Design a protein with these regions (language model features):
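Structural alpha/beta surface segment adjacent to cysteine/selenocysteine redox centers
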Residues: 19-122
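Local sequence-structure signature of Cys/Sec-based thiol-disulfide redox active-site neighborhoods
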Residues: 2-25
Length: 125
C-alpha cells in the first residue's frame, strides 16, 4: 500500500487567504484520488507583543477590496472583513485547535474558527 501524501499547512485564523484556500485544497485532494494527510500548523501572523491590525485603518479595507473580495467572489465564498478591532491574537485559538486535533476534530475546529471570525465577526482571542 502506498504511503499517504502529506501536506503541511501553516495558517492563522485571522488570514482571509487561509480561509479562501480551504475549498480549492479540498477539491484538489478529491481530484488526486490518493490518500492525503493534511497537517495544520499554527502560524500567528502577529504574535504578542506586536500590534495586530485594525479594520478602521486604511490597510485592511484596501487589501480586502483589491484582493480578498475578488478572490472570494471567484471561489463563491461568503467572507466579510471582521469588525473586531484590533484583530485578536490567535494563540489561545491555536491551543483550542490542539485539543480538538487530539480528539480527531481538528479540521472541523479550523472551519468553525474561520466562520466565527470571517462570517460572524467574533473575537477569537
Amino acid at each position: 500500500m502506498a504511503e499517504p501524501v502529506k501536506i503541511k499547512i501553516w495558517s492563522d485564523y485571522v488570514c482571509p487567504f487561509c480561509m479562501l484556500a480551504e475549498g480549492p485544497l479540498e477539491e484538489a485532494i478529491k481530484d488526486v484520488g490518493a490518500d492525503v494527510e493534511v497537517e495544520w500548523l499554527p502560524f500567528e501572523l502577529r504574535p504578542h507583543p506586536q500590534p495586530t491590525l485594525r479594520p478602521e485603518d486604511e490597510y485592511l479595507p484596501s487589501i480586502w477590496e483589491r484582493a480578498v473580495y475578488p478572490m472570494a467572489r471567484r471561489l463563491g465564498v461568503d467572507i466579510t472583513l471582521p469588525t473586531v478591532s484590533p484583530q485578536p491574537y490567535t494563540a489561545l485559538a491555536f491551543e483550542g485547535y490542539q485539543y480538538a486535533a487530539e480528539q480527531g476534530r481538528g479540521a472541523e475546529y479550523n472551519q468553525r474558527m474561520f466562520r466565527a471570525f470571517f462570517q460572524e465577526s467574533q473575537d477569537l482571542g
